[in-house]
């Protein structure tokens, strides 16, 4: 049955839009305060909302805007008690036919006022089940389950004022008292209604609960009036002290790779606990069962094990002057991996992983007393020959032989020679740990345990040579008998360490914790023993050891208690009298124990503080008139990578890239005055010399808002702020909204440091809210509470600035010169993996359609505030819906080039299809730490299938005679092991590849599936090998292929899986632009005659199309891009680390454009670049760079589109008959019987590859840009495998500009282009099934960013 046998009825498509009003015009009036510091606008908005919650009013920067629809009256702010209203600056109206793509300022503010009005009435009617949260609402189904509901408004050109409803599950839960009890899970906290990121000041949430502030009633009433949140009658309302994220308050999304880290500031805010929500990290796993506690009697055994560990750390490592030869203990061939040849490569960290395996998770969680006894019984007896001479020279070994046996039972590798890293063929007891990425990266001596991710740092210099801290213990009592004398407690550094840890149970002193933390009561044997130092190493040749048996042991000197590294400082006595005491006490690091830590105090400026998340930093074109001509060029060169502007929170809505007026290009750049901010860095001084101590930490960015001219919320508490309006505030305003939290016994101190202007600021800050309460007043006392909540009532962060998914533990990469090559390797592994690596458990949630009840809160509320409420159907918003045919791809069969439909990919192994552009051969080498038969069969079968499918030839490399072909078994993946392996690869390549064509060597490395850390670690291991080999043989090409470890352990693997893996290897081999298949050229259905007459800009035909998709992480740390042409013959992926640096971002943009121009140079004729910005957003700083770069290339025509697979607009399918496969899912009896003699008349169709194009009647607003609208909107849609009644898969495409006059034709061309290259997902081994309706280059960028955004880049200092 043909999929197009029936016609599709647009009436059966339900959209997520609901018509609420029929608009002819929208009236508006703008009020501007008389002075920049006037709070009249804030007071007026609250009073209007108190009088009428349905009023359409909004704050925008320093202005108050009032709106009405059609003939309704404008809400007037002329009310008593708030002073004389200022003159209206602007009054007028606009119609639905507003300009695009840049929305006029009144329309954008109208949408904001509409959304605020909907939120307030929803919350009032729902009895706080719907709580405003940023620019959205949180619907609480119960105490733990909740979802986010969006109410987005849009005015169509036909006058339909609509509200779009959608929901998204981001895992928000209401903060409860027991949320942080027990083992701490690093959850993210947020404040409602602002959506600001916050932190707990103490790990125990019970310590964060505080008494209500004295102006609590004022705050609750303000919440009721401004947001509809009614907590005034709440019983047992709890108040909690939280630390807000000031960066997020100012528009910066906290770095997602460090999202779970604690705040760097101690300034706090007191907030109702019912308005606090938590978000759990994706990798949080709550263990309901605890491991069996170790018996107390094992303490002595662990002491003996520790003695033996220290013995091995030093005695196996020889130093000059020792009596034992360096190769005696190992006796290995210097040419083999792990022999004496490794001494030149071995740093001290080599011994960490191999000899300390009892620190791993197995020794803590698996080693119960009963299991330890079972292992001891089953252990084979060991002879003295098992140890090298280096071990036997150490005294007291025989006394500790029991611990030696225990150590070998627990960790068999601990008794092996440290240099025997390769030739050991034994399989580890825990094969997962053998490839665990906990091995050190580079030369760092870090051991990460599996379950608790704890680090143990071993300083070998101290253990080997003995530093100044160990001199007093060097000749101490080394007898084991002292360990049994529990009354002996020698004063050591470890005692103070344990004291600090005991006083800090949450691990603040030692953030990473200790490697072993056994909960025992008998921990008295704390003396450190030096049994591991051989006699010939601790004696000098000229001074023989004194061996008088009657001589007493040296008396150890007690150690001094640890002191601060900063204070007190010791100075030369000659100058000590001239040194100021503050330097002796540590300077800025000094701390007075009598000082009082108090919550952060905010003050609010009405100059550019708004209740919008998009327009808090509005500025006008007049701001640029004051710029001096000599500074204009410097400001132009400055990037507008602002926190608010990046995601359109501070974009000037009334100005946008006027192409005709070059002077107006400066509107892209903000020119904020420093006085138009609220200063968080200025706090009242306590003493004159301690002013700087209490400053809030600077924003941890290279481009601070001060440097790029951004508005920052900072409470100016020194009286120099914007709120100093003495004449406007009378003595009757007695609110205490900004005073510090009182502390018992500190009244006099607070009085001394409270300035006169601080009192005035406190009074006028509360006046904005106290005016809505009526007669409510708060007497001014000498000690007053802090109610620093006004900024969290005025700011509303967009949900887009909050990550959908974050992790509590993130992999780390070093930001150095090698990072670019590392990212290139990593991107290829992430993109062309055919889904083998998994989704890393970081799949973001998607928007879903909302099904409304007939008598639900949403329907009743919208019916009460609007004149109508009717859902729009497809025929009302869609102008055209058309079927897009599948493209044909080029492949080879029996040596001939053929064309076949793109959905035939699943039959490729059965049809014996070959690559269209020739074979690629390679040499293979699989590295593992475990020798199993499945690993041998896996690599052998892989090589056989690759050659049998005629993809090329695969030669399995054999480095040594005793190895299997293509398989190397390593003892570990430590640095020294890999360096030695690199030396053997160099030897092999120089011997076997001199007179042969340069065939690349592909190294296969096993990784744990869906493991971020394993992927990063193994990629870094390969980069180490690659750099080492290419430093000696630059012409050798090394490639990487990560293989999931489960795949190598599976003895039964389907041939199809092998074939998919082989085709993925083919796509990775050079030349990388040559893939298995490409789009075939089709003959045109009609011939078009084009002449050169007329304006070239009006020509709508292009000879070639280049597609560039890119996205930038919401924290501005990473940038990813992918290139493709319309046939897929040109393809490339790349990523950059930005680190929130404007210089790096500009460099990345320049490089990105350079690569695009190079690709365009290989094309001919008129070329159109389809610049695709993902996430349905286009920040101004990015657009500025594209405009700057596009003018440098005249033969490259730029078309900018914003796309999104998960947007707030959804289409619900109710058609039961189209496409024709729907009846088959409903009832299989509708299927026709297949006629065996007419098989040639049938056609096999993959319904996952059947796509339709949609063109909307009116352009849609960008989902995450409130001030920008498309000039034409469309989508690629796919029907799901069901009988109907489900949401369509939709890939939304919004065209922002058109190089010619026919935007509809260009949009349809782009939809056809996207459909064609979307069919390459499976052929390029990028995606299978799920994302086949999305172009491959968009899917590639999405896969890169989904992973790399959780990687923590560490700058080298």
Swiss-Prot record:
GO cellular component: CKM complex; mediator complex
Principal place of residence: nucleus
Organism lineage: Eukaryota, Fungi, Dikarya, Ascomycota, Saccharomycotina
Assembly behavior: Component of the SRB8-11 complex, which itself associates with the Mediator complex.
Keywords of the record: Activator, Nucleus, Repressor, Transcription, Transcription regulation
Name of the featured protein: Mediator of RNA polymerase II transcription subunit 13
Any one GO molecular function term: transcription coactivator activity
GO biological process terms, semicolon-separated: negative regulation of transcription by RNA polymerase II; positive regulation of transcription by RNA polymerase II
Keyword check for Nucleus: yes
């Amino acid at each position: 049955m043909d999929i197009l046998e029936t016609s599709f009825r647009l009436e059966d498509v339900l959209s997520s839009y609901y018509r609420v009003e029929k608009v002819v015009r929208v009236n508006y009036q703008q009020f501007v305060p008389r002075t920049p510091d006037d709070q009249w606008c804030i007071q007026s908005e609250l009073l209007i909302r108190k009088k009428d919650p349905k009023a359409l009013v909004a704050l925008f920067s320093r202005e108050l805007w009032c709106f009405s629809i059609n003939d309704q009256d404008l809400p007037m702010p002329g009310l008593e008690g708030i002073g004389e209203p200022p003159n209206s600056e602007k009054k007028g109206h606009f119609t639905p036919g507003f300009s695009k793509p840049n929305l006029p300022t009144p329309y954008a503010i109208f949408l904001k006022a509409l959304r605020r009005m909907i939120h307030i009435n929803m919350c009032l009617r729902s009895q706080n089940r719907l709580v405003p949260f940023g620019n959205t609402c949180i619907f609480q189904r119960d105490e733990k389950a909740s979802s986010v509901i969006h109410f987005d408004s849009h005015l169509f050109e036909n006058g339909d004022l609509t509200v779009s409803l959608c929901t998204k599950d981001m895992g928000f839960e209401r903060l409860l008292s027991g949320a942080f009890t027990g083992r701490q899970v690093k959850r993210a906290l947020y404040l409602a209604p602002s959506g600001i990121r916050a932190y707990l000041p103490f790990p125990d949430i019970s310590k964060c609960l505080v008494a209500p502030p004295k102006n609590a009633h004022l705050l609750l009433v303000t919440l009721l009036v401004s947001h509809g949140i009614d907590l005034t009658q709440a019983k047992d309302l709890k108040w909690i002290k939280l630390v807000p994220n000031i960066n997020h308050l100012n528009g910066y999304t906290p770095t997602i790779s460090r999202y779970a880290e604690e705040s760097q500031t101690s300034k706090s805010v007191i907030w109702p606990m019912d308005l606090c929500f938590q978000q759990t990290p994706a990798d949080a796993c709550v263990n309901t069962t605890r491991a069996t506690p170790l018996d107390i009697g094992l303490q002595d055994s662990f002491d003996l094990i520790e003695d033996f560990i220290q013995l091995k750390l030093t005695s196996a490592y020889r130093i000059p002057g020792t009596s034992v030869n360096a190769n005696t203990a190992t006796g290995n061939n210097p040419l083999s991996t792990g022999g004496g040849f490794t001494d030149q490569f071995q740093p001290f960290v080599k011994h960490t992983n191999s000899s300390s395996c009892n620190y791993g998770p197995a020794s803590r969680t698996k080693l119960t007393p009963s299991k330890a006894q079972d292992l001891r019984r089953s252990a084979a007896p060991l002879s003295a020959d098992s140890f090298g001479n280096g071990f036997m020279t150490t005294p007291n070994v025989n006394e500790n032989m029991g611990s030696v046996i225990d150590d070998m039972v627990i960790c068999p590798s601990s008794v092996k020679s440290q240099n025997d890293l390769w030739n050991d063929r034994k399989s580890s007891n825990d094969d997962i740990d053998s490839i665990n990425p906990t091995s050190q990266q580079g030369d760092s001596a870090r051991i990460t345990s599996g379950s608790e991710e704890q680090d143990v740092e071993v300083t070998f210099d101290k253990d080997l040579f003995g530093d100044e801290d160990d001199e007093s213990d060097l000749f101490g009592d080394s007898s084991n008998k002292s360990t049994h004398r529990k009354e002996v407690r020698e004063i050591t550094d470890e005692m103070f360490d344990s004291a600090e840890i005991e006083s800090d149970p949450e691990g603040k002193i030692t953030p990473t914790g200790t490697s072993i933390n056994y909960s025992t009561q008998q921990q008295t044997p704390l003396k450190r023993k030096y049994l591991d130092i051989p006699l010939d190493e601790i004696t000098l040749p000229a001074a023989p050891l004194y061996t008088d048996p009657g001589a007493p042991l040296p008396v150890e000197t007690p150690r001094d208690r640890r002191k601060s590294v900063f204070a007190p400082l010791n100075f030369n006595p000659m100058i000590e009298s001239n040194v100021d005491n503050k330097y002796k006490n540590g300077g800025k690091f000094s701390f007075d124990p009598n000082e009082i830590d108090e919550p952060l105090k905010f003050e609010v400026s009405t100059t550019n503080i708004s209740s919008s998340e998009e327009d808090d930093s509005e500025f006008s074109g007049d701001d640029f008139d004051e710029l001096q001509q000599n500074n204009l060029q410097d400001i132009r060169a400055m990037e507008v990578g602002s926190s608010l502007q990046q995601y359109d929170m501070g974009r000037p809505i009334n100005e946008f890239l006027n192409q005709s007026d070059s002077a107006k290009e400066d509107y892209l750049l903000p020119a904020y005055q420093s006085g138009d901010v609220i200063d968080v860095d200025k706090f009242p001084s306590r003493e004159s010399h301690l002013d700087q101590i209490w400053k809030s930490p600077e924003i941890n960015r290279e481009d601070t808002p001060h440097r790029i001219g951004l508005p920052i919320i900072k409470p100016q508490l020194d009286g120099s702020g914007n709120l100093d309006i003495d004449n406007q505030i009378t003595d009757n305003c007695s609110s205490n909204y900004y005073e510090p939290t009182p502390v018992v016994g500190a009244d006099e101190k607070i009085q001394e440091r409270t300035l006169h202007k601080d009192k005035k600021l406190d009074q006028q800050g509360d006046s904005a809210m106290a005016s809505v309460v009526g007669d409510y007043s708060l007497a001014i006392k000498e000690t007053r509470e802090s109610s620093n909540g006004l900024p969290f009532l005025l700011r509303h962060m967009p949900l887009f600035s909050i990550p959908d998914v974050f992790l509590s533990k993130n992999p780390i990469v070093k930001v150095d010169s090698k990072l670019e090559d590392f990212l290139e390797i990593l991107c290829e592994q992430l993109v062309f993996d055919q889904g083998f690596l998994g989704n890393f458990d970081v799949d973001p949630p998607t928007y879903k359609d909302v099904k409304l009840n007939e008598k639900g809160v949403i329907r009743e509320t919208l019916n009460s505030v609007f004149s109508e409420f009717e859902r729009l159907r497809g025929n009302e918003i869609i102008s055209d819906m058309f079927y897009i045919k599948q493209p044909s791809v080029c492949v080879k069969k029996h040596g001939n080039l053929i064309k076949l439909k793109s959905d035939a990919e699943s039959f490729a192994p059965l049809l014996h299809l070959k690559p269209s552009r020739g074979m690629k051969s390679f040499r293979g080498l699989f590295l593992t730490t475990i020798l199993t038969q499945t690993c041998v069969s896996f690599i052998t079968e892989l090589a056989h299938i690759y050659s049998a499918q005629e993809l090329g030839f695969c030669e399995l490399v054999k480095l040594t005679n005793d190895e299997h072909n293509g398989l190397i078994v390593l003892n570990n993946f430590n640095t020294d092991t890999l360096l030695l392996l690199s030396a053997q690869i160099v030897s092999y390549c120089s011997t076997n590849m001199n007179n042969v064509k340069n065939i690349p060597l592909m190294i296969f490395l096993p990784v744990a599936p869906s493991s971020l850390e394993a992927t990063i670690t193994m990629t870094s291991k390969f980069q180490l090998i690659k750099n080492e080999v290419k430093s000696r043989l630059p012409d050798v090409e090394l490639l990487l292929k990560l293989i999931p470890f489960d795949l190598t352990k599976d003895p039964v693997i389907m041939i199809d899986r092998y074939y998919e893996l082989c085709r993925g290897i083919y796509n990775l081999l050079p030349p990388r632009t040559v893939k298995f298949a490409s789009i075939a050229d089709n003959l045109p259905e009609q011939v078009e005659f084009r002449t050169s007459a007329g304006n070239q800009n009006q020509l709508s035909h292009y000879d070639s199309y280049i597609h560039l998709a890119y996205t930038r992480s919401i924290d501005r740390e990473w940038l990813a891009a992918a290139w493709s042409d319309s046939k897929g013959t040109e393809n490339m992926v790349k990523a950059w680390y930005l680190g929130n640096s404007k210089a790096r971002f500009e460099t990345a943009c320049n490089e990105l454009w350079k690569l695009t121009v190079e690709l365009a140079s290989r094309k001919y004729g008129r070329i159109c670049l389809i610049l695709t910005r993902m996430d349905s957003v286009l920040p101004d700083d990015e657009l500025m760079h594209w405009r700057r770069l596009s003018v440098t290339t005249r033969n490259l025509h730029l078309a900018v589109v914003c796309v999104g697979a998960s947007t707030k607009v959804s289409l619900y399918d109710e058609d039961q008959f189209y496409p024709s496969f729907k009846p088959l899912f409903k009832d299989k009896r509708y299927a026709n019987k297949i006629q065996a003699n007419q098989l040639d008349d049938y056609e096999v169709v993959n319904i996952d590859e059947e796509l339709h194009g949609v063109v909307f009647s009116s352009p849609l607003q960008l989902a995450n840009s409130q001030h920008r609208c498309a000039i034409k909107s469309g989508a690629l849609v796919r029907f799901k495998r069901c009988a109907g009644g489900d949401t369509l898969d939709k890939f939304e495409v919004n065209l922002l500009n058109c190089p010619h006059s026919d935007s509809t034709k260009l949009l349809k061309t782009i939809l056809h282009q996207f459909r064609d290259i979307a069919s390459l997902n499976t052929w390029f081994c990028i995606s299978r099934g799920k994302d086949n309706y999305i172009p491959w280059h968009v899917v590639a960028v999405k896969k890169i960013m989904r992973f790399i955004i959780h990687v923590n880049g560490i700058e080298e200092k």
